[in-house]
Amino acid sequence: YRQIKEGRAQVMLTGGSEASVNEIGIAGFATLTALSPEKDPLKASLPFDRNRSGFVMGEGGATLVLENLEHAQKRNATILGEVVGYGSTCDAFHITSPDPTGEGAARAMKQAIDEAGITPDKVGYVNAHGTATHANDSGESLAINKVFGENSSVMVSSTKSMTGHLLGAAGAIEAAITVRALKMQQLPENVGLNELDEECNINIVTKDKTTTSNLEYAISNSLGFGGHNAVLALRKWSE
């Protein structure tokens, strides 16, 4: 994004892929007690739920073509969305755990929104990192409330409730999902939510809240181990 914005490139391919559902991958994350021990698939990946117990590993990938407007128009590309901001911070709190106050994640969201040249109230949807671990979901909820306010109407969901955690591919596929949400004006549901954790005081996208008609801006959060926080601000494309 920055390479293109600052004129060092016209077009770049970005993305990630992951295929780590194997003995070593599972053993490593199990040792960290990050994986859900639930055997029932319907109870295994429950972002923001009171009874969440960890994440489910997933496999997959996504590639996004980023290019400047002139380049896209010259080749008659179908433009799906616009990247308008980016934020990046590091908690420097713990080797794996995020800062429980959500301070670093909040700063990354604020950076992305500021670069987009908008105020937080213009953002209608947050694609949360939402791993279904206790530490991430409670801390990320605090961070969202720091940025948008506790009584904000911004809608939030974690698509890891459907895809599992794609690890190195999570950011790419969740950015693609967020772009599609903007284009289709359809918010992805946070499936599997039975009882919202009181520590996660945010507006979750449930089955009856997926349709929207005025979604112009959204952000996608990627909050990695060790508090490595990256946030994309995206805008619905219009001529």
Residue ranges of each PLM-predicted region?
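Beta-strand segments within the central parallel beta-sheet cores of soluble alpha/beta enzyme folds
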Residues: 9-17, 78-86, 121-128, 154-161, ...
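Active-site-adjacent elements of ketosynthase-type condensing enzymes
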Residues: 19-45, 87-107, 131-143, 184-217
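Conserved small-residue
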Residues: 29, 65, 83, 123, ...
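Conserved catalytic cysteine-centered active-site region
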Residues: 31-56, 141-172
